[in-house]
């Protein structure tokens, strides 16, 4: 068993527009408070579902006051909160109340048993990489954002191919005609990048993966770069091209705009139950080993 820091103040975050989220959040809050932890709610969550008298805090206030944030929802909820809390180095515990749940790895049915043990110090910790990106237009930055999974440059549904000029560390790599380009972290390698035939990167691998989306030339293949690479993507052709960050914020692009992407100085601490296995997560979520010749241990 790995014993880490024991927490005092615990922030609860839920996907507030999800039907049926109020009851499990209230149940978890009562369970945690009964064991002597101070419970606070993220403000939007509290407003949407009611916080039963618990303090309601903004993400910045959570970062300053809470020792850990427990997120009940899907991966999208975890991504959004991870970006907001990254500057404060607040650890996240993810409880899956969505569908796939690559990064919300605790089943909701187990949360009342597992979460109190983790808050008491029984957990495994890992750091996840973030990307930071900015859009440069006519030599001036016009937009800045963080991305936990990926930065995606792509065309709209009814326009032709995008034409992109890609450079790494100031060196020209290629011009590409495609539906777009994904720049993904190891965490994001199992998201949109995976569906575009990109490789899976272990979360502790120090790399950034570039994955073309439906490239015109089949020789345009995914490539894994060192995680200290500075990537520049210039729009040199095409109409209705945009960029999104974790599929949660979007910006329209113009001809000659450049998207500059690099590893962020921030990381996001994830806390997992003792015995957590990334490979078990892959087996379960990707349906590997569906018909095994022999059963393997979950922690293999």
UniProtKB/Swiss-Prot annotation:
UniProt-listed Enzyme Commission number(s): 2.7.1.23
Keyword hit for Transit peptide: no
Residues binding NAD(+): 75-76, 149-150, 177, 179, 190-195, 214, 248
Cofactor list: a divalent metal cation
Enzyme class, spelled out: transferase
Superkingdom of the organism of origin: Bacteria
GO cellular component, one term: cytoplasm
Reactions catalysed: NAD(+) + ATP = ADP + NADP(+) + H(+)
Main location: cytoplasm
Xref: NCBIfam families: PRK02155.1
Family membership noted in the UniProt record: Belongs to the NAD kinase family.
Role description: Involved in the regulation of the intracellular balance of NAD and NADP, and is a key enzyme in the biosynthesis of NADP. Catalyzes specifically the phosphorylation on 2'-hydroxyl of the adenosine moiety of NAD to yield NADP.
Name this polypeptide is given: NAD kinase
